[in-house]
Amino acid sequence: MSHLQQKFGAFPTGIWVALLALAILMLAWGMQAYSLLNWDHAVSLGIQNERFSDDPAETAWALESWGVAMADMLWPLPLTVVALVGILRRRFFGLAAGLMACAVGVYFPLFFAFQRWQTFRGTVFLTLMLFSAPCLIAVIGLWANRSWFRDS
């Protein structure tokens, strides 16, 4: 873990990893926000399911995805913004919010993976590598550098 504590420019390496993971999470929340604004185009891109399908399973899956997208706007998106601001200001709330946001970043791809492994293995693997792996390393990096944060 000492390599995550090595200073690299303005921040220790573990903090850089956390900032990168949080930036990647902002991409995920941005895609979810876009889905809510233009669901039909998100369907055409293949990132959401058709809401008005004749297939009841497809419709149910789309409604579940819409609910997840809405929930992402209410909790993980603001939490990620708070984490970024707090980490850049070296505040303890940044550490706490960063750990929480990255925990969500590990959880949601695992949920996605178990839900869709049989039909979308390539996408599942990409999602795990793009989101879960950096977020897991970010949790370790934040924890390794917890003394770097100021209490006030």
Regions found by a protein language model. Give the residues of each.
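Topology signature of small-to-medium multi-pass alpha-helical membrane proteins
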Residues: 2-152
